[in-house]
Amino acid sequence: KKGEIVLEDQILALTAELAAVKSAAQVTNTMFAEAYYYLTIPLMVLIHAGFLLYEMGQTRVANVLSSGIKNLLAFAFTIVTFYLFGWWFYWALPTFPVTSLVSGAGFMGTSGLEYASAIALPWGESAQYMGPNMGDHASGVFWGAFALFAATTASIASGALIERIQTVGWVICAIVLGSFAWVVAAAWGWHADGWLVTEFGFHDFGAAGLVHAVAGFFALGILLNLGPRVGKFNADGSANKIAGHNIPLTITGLMLIIVGFFGFLMACIILPGEGWSWYGDGGATIYGTPITLSALAFNVCLAASGGIIGAWVFTRDPFWMMSGCL
């Protein structure tokens, strides 16, 4: 009997130790996930530093300061407005207009008016997810990464509007583009409940198609109204080449953008082992398909290099060589 009691005590002790080890492992995994997404945010800020330098380098001297201020203000206003309403739109609209906003969540249960209002408004009960909360290690870093996606979309359109738009007008456009237009597209095609995904099987791992399509068509719509840069065309209709004032600045911006791309795509991976994870043993895309950082390393390095080489072979022009990389 004494032996049985001792054995039972040992089993209980081992059970307690195992529970403690599991708890510690979960804490470690949670802290790693938080740090992982946190580090993607400053990497993505480098994208904006890169776009700022890239655009300023391609601007004529008289408009350099205006170009830089335009980028800084767009960055700041997009993040603030994404906090106020952009994040809410992302969670509220995935199934709209296929279903009504009030008809409930999608098949994953992470969308719809009720769900968005519970987690994505910066006031009321949902403010616990939109501010400091010692028990929440995910909402803040997820929001930060998504906010940088929104700001990146605005930065892409900014380059097409060099020397064509006033600062206040551009800030308004950046808010509409980054905190609404792109967010709606992301809700439809870059969300597991999005109707483009559930109805048509649309997949866009890094949101590259959504970001560039929305930013590109948005910029095109503005350009159709604004017209060409002052001094681009002569009276006889012939075109003038408007060269940037500082190519080294543009090249530096390009390299910063490449660094930022790694952070952008890192943030697109759903890490394993958490309550919000797809799997317990491997990373996944936002759609639940398997993905690894190794795959991203191959793709980003080869894509950037291939773009530079291809543009150099066909143009021998420094600007188009850099644009080929982008």
PLM regions with names:
Residues 6-326:
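Hydrophobic alpha-helical transmembrane bundles of multi-pass membrane proteins
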Residues 1-5:
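N-terminal amphipathic/basic-hydrophobic helices that include classical n-h-c signal peptides
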